[in-house]
C-alpha cells in the first residue's frame, strides 16, 4: 500500500492529543481481505485506555463549549478540507483494508467529508425556537446547546462516513485518519 503522505497511516490510539499504544502493548493485525497481506496493526485497547479517552474528552469539553458557533464551524471546516485534500490516500487505505473498488472508496471519503461540512455550516445556524404554548401565561423556549461527550455504535459498512463506527478488527485503519 503506497500513500502520498505516509504520516496519514497511524497505528496507535489518539488519546488526549497524543498517539499511543495499548497499555498492554498488544495489537490486532489488520489484513487486506483480497490478499491476506498484513497492512498493519491497531492497539488492542482495554478499559483503562477507554477511560482515559473519555476523561480527556470531558476535560476538553468546557473549552469546546466556550467557543462560538463560528469558531467551532471553522474547526469542522478545516477537518472537511483535510479529508478532501487527502481523499486519494484515504481511498487507497480503505481499498486495502476493505476490498472496496478505489472509486467507491474515494466516493465514501467525499461522502464522509460532506457530513462534516454540513455540521460546520449548520452549526452556525443554531437558533432557539419559541413553541406555541398551551396556556396564556406560559412561554416555551427551546435553547440548543452542546450537551457533552457522547459515543455511538453504528454499522461498519462505511468506516469513513461512520466515524463513530463500532470497531471491527478487520477494518479499523480508515476510521483513525
Regions inferred by a protein language model and the residue ranges of each:
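Residue-level signature of catalytic and energy-coupling elements of molecular machines
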Residues: 17, 36, 72, 116, ...
Amino acid at each position: 500500500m503506497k500513500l502520498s503522505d505516509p504520516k496519514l497511516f497511524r497505528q496507535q490510539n489518539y488519546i488526549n492529543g497524543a498517539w499511543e499504544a495499548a497499555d498492554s502493548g498488544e495489537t490486532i493485525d489488520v489484513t487486506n481481505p483480497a490478499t491476506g497481506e498484513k497492512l498493519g496493526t491497531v492497539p488492542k485497547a482495554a478499559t483503562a485506555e477507554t477511560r482515559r479517552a473519555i476523561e480527556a474528552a470531558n476535560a476538553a469539553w468546557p473549552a469546546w463549549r466556550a467557543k462560538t458557533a463560528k469558531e467551532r464551524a471553522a474547526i469542522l471546516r478545516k477537518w472537511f478540507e483535510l479529508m478532501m485534500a487527502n481523499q486519494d490516500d484515504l481511498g487507497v487505505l480503505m481499498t486495502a483494508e476493505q476490498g472496496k473498488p478505489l472509486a467507491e472508496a474515494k466516493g465514501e471519503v467525499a461522502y464522509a467529508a460532506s457530513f462534516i461540512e454540513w455540521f460546520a455550516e449548520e452549526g452556525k445556524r443554531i437558533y432557539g425556537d419559541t413553541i406555541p404554548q398551551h396556556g396564556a401565561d406560559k412561554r416555551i423556549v427551546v435553547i440548543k446547546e452542546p450537551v457533552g461527550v457522547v459515543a455511538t455504535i453504528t454499522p461498519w459498512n462505511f468506516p469513513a462516513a461512520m466515524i463513530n463506527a463500532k470497531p471491527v478488527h478487520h477494518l479499523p485503519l480508515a476510521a483513525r485518519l
